[in-house]
């Protein structure tokens, strides 16, 4: 018997859950692993909330959805190239879940756009709504996961105390780098054709 796409994805999700559970059992530092697991659970909940708005039935409004109607697992997280596919399940009425695609406004693509172009265009169209609140940090992200990673990795004491002696010579640019190669790359890609 041939498995449909939804069954394959559920199976993949179950395999990943088992792998994670095995890592939890093998890990010696239970306290550290519980923190990691908490982050993992928060990420899954946030991702499901974001997906809920993408994968609703066309005949249902957001206000009509209940907790039972939410997806059983995160389709996009496991299978990135969903495109125009339809998935069965997840909605209590058994209706099809349609993955919405917005029409492309870029004429260079001939009105069509693939998944790679779609995400790139959304990121460059000012969709960065999650901003870092630390004073002096102007980083913005398209998802809460990017911001969460930035807060965890970008503002750690280890990262904050790195000596960066190579300063961009252009006025108004306060970028600093650990080595000369980083500065050269920055000047070539961000200040090409400008004079210092």
From Swiss-Prot:
Pfam families: zf-C2H2 (PF00096). One of its GO terms (molecular function) is zinc ion binding. GO terms for cellular component: nucleus. A zinc finger (C2H2-type) spans 130-155, 166-191. It comes from the Eukaryota. SUPFAM superfamilies: beta-beta-alpha zinc fingers. Keywords: Metal-binding, Repeat, Zinc, Zinc-finger. This is Zinc finger C2H2 protein ECU03_0940. It comes from Encephalitozoon cuniculi (strain GB-M1).
């Amino acid at each position: 018997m041939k498995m449909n796409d939804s069954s394959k994805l559920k199976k993949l999700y179950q395999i990943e859950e088992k792998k994670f559970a095995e890592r939890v059992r093998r890990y010696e530092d239970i306290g550290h692993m519980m923190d990691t697991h908490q982050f993992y659970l928060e990420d899954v909940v946030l991702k499901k909330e974001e997906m809920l708005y993408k994968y609703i039935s066309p005949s249902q409004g957001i206000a009509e959805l209940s907790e039972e109607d939410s997806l059983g697992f995160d389709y996009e997280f496991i299978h990135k190239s969903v495109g125009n596919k339809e998935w069965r399940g997840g909605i209590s009425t058994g209706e099809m879940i349609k993955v919405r695609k917005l029409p492309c406004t870029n004429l260079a693509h001939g009105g069509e756009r693939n998944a790679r172009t779609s995400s790139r265009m959304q990121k460059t169209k000012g969709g960065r709504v999650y901003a870092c609140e630390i004073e002096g940090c102007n980083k913005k992200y398209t998802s809460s996961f990017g911001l969460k990673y930035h807060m965890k990795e970008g503002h750690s004491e280890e990262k904050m105390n790195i000596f960066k002696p190579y300063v961009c010579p252009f006025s108004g640019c306060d970028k600093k780098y650990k080595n000369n190669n980083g500065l050269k790359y920055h000047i070539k890609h961000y200040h090409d054709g400008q004079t210092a």
